């Protein structure tokens, strides 16, 4: 057994003397995710965020693919980043020239080496492939740039031939070789053996690029590092072709927290970076996504919640904390919730209860949850207010007075909202793509300088059937400090339900910030 933190032992031997370089391909392979298309300005902003995160190499794109991609790579290359900017190129001079014209510091050139890809895509013999690879490497080195060579589909390539290819490019002056699991067919034990075999024959650094077709990309990357690889290719949120690539956050935190391996990643920016990619790609992470997902440090079970509140190491990894990755710990209320979790949630909003009152609140919360209802912060405070005999409006920032909307097939949807903000009546009118959008924009306008939040989730459900169904609107809000609240409202009028839910959530944020 090995110890990385006092009181917590592992079967994995630490590799604390090793350092791994992080190669991020979010802007190249990540953008090949079906349905994803990033603008040049978004790519530049993402590259600055990756630089802030501490990524060693950014693969900024495939310059030959379009004039726009070439200009985007060039703008990133000249953005004054600390990281090395890389461009992708086939083993063709025109591709490599496009990388030169993009001012990159590293050219990543590749050619298929497996029989299935070599025969059916480029129609070249094994000897011709080696010649193309060597000429490409020499051409790059003759121009004074660093070169990484990829044997595409390496994990389905004849092992002896693969070693022959790598030896040839090494002799030609290649700086680093990449072993890509292009179609994600490796298992960790096989990846370990393959990298071990390559490392025994090759003296230059080894990089791995693992795809996630069977959900093994991160595990394969870790096994490659155990076997001798010193660089991993990853993407933010694991985006990429088909099922994606090895996820940066999961790979880096496993290396750092479990193996004790050093990287240059500033892990406190992991969640921040993940959210940027979510917003720009439109691909939302499942709540249970490791490291950066909403539920990564969330607890509902009474036993788990009580243990975490006493000592977080009891039901969390211990060697990875929410603070390390820029996250927050959450205690979620539901039918499994215990007294400790309810008490902590109430106290975070400044609500004090007696033991008897707390017992009654817990009982009511469980009754609601057992009916299949998701418990929001608003539900908890409404129940607590009823039990404590307090008016729920005592600490409201906003009190809704009136909502009116106009919409139709030829009218621009318009909403007028009247509300009291700390006793001052304010009216706002806004247009939108629909009446709900217009009404929510009007509420934001009323808030003015208090409007420092992100609408994290917006969901509408019909509680009853028929045309007169009750609309149940669920809203999740996150403020600039990363604090998340949830609220809901039910109303036969979908616009009213939406506005009420947003105002309920804003009042909860205000209440929590005051406490």
Swiss-Prot record:
Record carries keyword Metal-binding: yes
Q: List, alphabetically, the CDD domains matched.
A: DRE_TIM_IPMS
* Cofactors that this protein relies on: a divalent metal cation
The superkingdom of the source organism is Archaea
List the PROSITE patterns hit by this protein, alphabetically: AIPM_HOMOCIT_SYNTH_1 (PS00815), AIPM_HOMOCIT_SYNTH_2 (PS00816), PYR_CT (PS50991)
- GO function terms (MF aspect): 2-isopropylmalate synthase activity; metal ion binding
Q: Which GO terms describe its biological process?
A: coenzyme B biosynthetic process; L-leucine biosynthetic process
The Pyruvate carboxyltransferase domain covers which part of the protein? Answer: 20-271
Q: So where does a divalent metal cation get bound?
A: 29, 209, 211, 245
Q: What does it catalyze?
A: 3-methyl-2-oxobutanoate + acetyl-CoA + H2O = (2S)-2-isopropylmalate + CoA + H(+)
Give the Enzyme Commission number: 2.3.3.13
Role according to the record:
Catalyzes the condensation of the acetyl group of acetyl-CoA with 3-methyl-2-oxobutanoate (2-oxoisovalerate) to form 3-carboxy-3-hydroxy-4-methylpentanoate (2-isopropylmalate).
Instruction: Please describe the quaternary structure of this protein.
Output: Homodimer.
Write the protein's name. Probable 2-isopropylmalate synthase
- Organism (species): Methanosarcina acetivorans (strain ATCC 35395 / DSM 2834 / JCM 12185 / C2A)
According to the entry, what is the taxonomic lineage of the organism?
A: Archaea, Methanobacteriati, Methanobacteriota, Stenosarchaea group, Methanomicrobia
